[in-house]
A protein has these predicted regions:
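A short Gly-Trp-Pro
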Residues: 2-122
Length: 122
């Protein structure tokens, strides 16, 4: 079942928008847990794979169990990332920036995510 989205969340997840840099609640978030899709609650990213890229959006160097679909943007310049379960737009993935050993950065809009804290689910 899909969650009812706010107008701002709809702008990101459905209309493929981008929130302003450094505006999202998860940009500097550091709690242990799982980031899930705001629209369908599918697990997407672990806090173990989150890192500070100082780019203005939450950054991860891996996804959970092939939970993210990757599509080349229409202009071919960037690769869009979507929730594999509901198709919600999450952001983009970038390669070759050398932030981590995996050498990939999932650049994700905070508005496309919810967070499940490990402490609360234990």
């Amino acid at each position: 079942m899909l969650k009812k989205l706010s107008p701002q969340e709809r702008k990101i997840l459905i209309e493929k928008g981008t929130e302003p840099p450094f505006s999202g609640i998860y940009c500097d978030h550091s709690a242990n847990g799982t980031y899930v899709c705001k629209q369908c609650a599918s697990p997407l990213f672990s806090s173990d794979n989150k890192f500070h890229s100082h780019c203005g959006w939450p950054s991860f160097d891996d996804e959970i169990n092939q939970s993210v679909q990757k599509n080349l943007d229409e202009d071919g310049a960037r690769t869009e990332i979507l929730c594999v379960n509901c198709g919600g737009h999450l952001g983009h993935i970038f390669y070759g920036e050398n932030f981590t050993k995996k050498n990939q950065r999932y650049c994700v809009n905070s508005l496309s995510l919810d967070f499940l804290d490990d402490k609360k689910s234990a």
